[in-house]
């Protein structure tokens, strides 16, 4: 189908076949499915395989264009310059000094293609880098995380064009500074315990819990208890909102919000912490 997916494995092992790539995965690995890429999952391990999949299918269903094919036949790539590729592209040209331009139809139906690859973020590799963030001091005001970045999304900061996936380490006793943003977030906690405050209400969570942790524009923060660190996967529709110029973000509730991607964003005190 035309959905762009992000997947993670909750338990078990297996192989994701995405296009012409085979991706062997283990627990907590993350990978993506480019839109329209033929894909299937195989449980070639000895245990039950449980996966979480995040996709834009719901949005496409609301648009009434959610198209899915079962057992599709692989298509042959069209020959360059053939009828299917539409020939050459015409250049857009400016009509004033501010940048308003006109683009010919030949380019409208043949935009510059950018390959979309299946990518894999093994948890073992990600964790080795993530654990280094656990040593940042308590005075740090940012989040101890890495975005699983797909370079195809460029400045839109995505794992797919619609979503980002981040992995967070939360050392014992860390309480985040409250903030809010238009983008919505879903957290999957897979190690440790803690709580979240969302619009003034407290929610307790533990490893294995899945939570809509930040509805759009809801003030929220998260905290870990003192006994052990937390690992969590967050899925958020930030890239889509950046592209729509709708990503209003308030990192500090005492300061004005900003539209990320259109205006300058925020800074942390990372350089001043150890």
Regions found by a protein language model. Give the residues of each.
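Conserved short histidine dyad/triad with adjacent acidic residue
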Residues: 1, 146-154, 165-180, 217-218
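A short hydrophobic beta-strand segment most commonly corresponding to one strand
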Residues: 6-8, 32, 46-66, 187-188, ...
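An N-terminus-focused feature that recognizes amino-terminal "leader" regions
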Residues: 1-23, 141-148, 234-236, 269-273
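A short beta-strand-loop-beta hairpin characteristic of the jelly-roll/cupin
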Residues: 1-29, 33-37, 180, 184-207, ...
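A short, N-terminal "cap"/entry segment at the start of jelly-roll beta-barrel domains
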Residues: 77-162, 248, 259-274
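Short, surface-exposed secondary-structure boundary micro-motifs
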Residues: 36, 216-217
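Contiguous mid-protein beta-loop-alpha structural module that forms a pocket-lining wall or clamp
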Residues: 36-93
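Asparagine-centered strand-capping/turn motif at beta-strand->loop junctions
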Residues: 42-43, 222-225
């Amino acid at each position: 189908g035309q959905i762009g997916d992000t997947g993670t494995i909750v338990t078990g092992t297996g192989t994701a076949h995405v296009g012409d790539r085979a991706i062997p995965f283990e627990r907590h690995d993350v990978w993506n499915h480019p839109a329209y890429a033929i894909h299937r999952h195989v449980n070639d391990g000895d245990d039950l395989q449980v996966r979480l999949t995040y996709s834009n299918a719901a949005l496409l269903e609301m648009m009434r264009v959610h198209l899915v094919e079962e057992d599709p036949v692989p298509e042959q790539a069209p020959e360059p310059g053939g009828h299917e590729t539409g020939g050459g592209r015409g250049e857009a040209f400016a009509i004033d000094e501010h940048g308003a331009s006109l683009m010919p139809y030949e380019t409208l139906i043949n935009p510059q293609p950018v390959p979309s690859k299946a990518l894999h973020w093994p948890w073992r590799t990600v964790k080795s880098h993530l654990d280094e963030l656990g040593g940042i001091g308590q005075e740090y005001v940012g989040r101890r995380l890495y975005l699983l970045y797909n370079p195809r999304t460029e400045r839109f900061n995505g794992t797919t064009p619609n979503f980002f996936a981040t992995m967070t380490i939360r050392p014992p006793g860390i309480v985040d500074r409250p903030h809010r943003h238009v983008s919505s977030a879903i957290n999957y906690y897979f190690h440790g315990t803690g709580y979240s405050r969302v619009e003034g209400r407290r929610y307790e969570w533990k490893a294995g819990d899945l939570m809509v942790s930040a509805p759009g524009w809801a003030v929220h923060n998260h905290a870990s208890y003192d006994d052990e660190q937390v690992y969590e996967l967050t899925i958020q529709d930030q890239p889509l909102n950046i592209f729509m110029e709708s990503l209003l973000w308030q990192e500090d509730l005492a300061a004005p919000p900003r539209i990320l991607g259109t205006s300058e964003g925020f800074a942390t005190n990372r350089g001043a912490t150890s």
